[in-house]
């Protein structure tokens, strides 16, 4: 009998580096629109797995982002929206079960 190897069918999930395909050698820190593609919503530098860049271009992008931050072209962090809860009073802080017990005792 012949030994047949199982062929795994699947897609090639690996992305090609956008910078390699367009032959970009220098990532300009002044090009804020281009750099913001590599920054998350919080302001962190995205990893190469999510951006699809190769290691060489990931280093160049990271350096460009750091330079742009230092030159105050982009912020270090994004503004977070903070929702403050209203101060709880003594009546609203009690659990409903405790309220029911107090009402039963009072009646």
UniProtKB/Swiss-Prot annotation:
GO molecular-function term, one example from the UniProt record: structural constituent of ribosome
Keywords: Ribonucleoprotein, Ribosomal protein, RNA-binding, rRNA-binding
GO biological process, one term: translation
GO cellular component: cytosolic small ribosomal subunit
Annotated function: Binds as a heterodimer with protein bS6 to the central domain of the 16S rRNA, where it helps stabilize the platform of the 30S subunit.
Similarity remark: Belongs to the bacterial ribosomal protein bS18 family.
Known partners and oligomeric status: Part of the 30S ribosomal subunit. Forms a tight heterodimer with protein bS6.
NCBIfam families found in the cross-reference section: S18
Name assigned to this protein: Small ribosomal subunit protein bS18
Taxonomic source organism: Mycoplasmopsis agalactiae (strain NCTC 10123 / CIP 59.7 / PG2) (Mycoplasma agalactiae)
Gene: rpsR
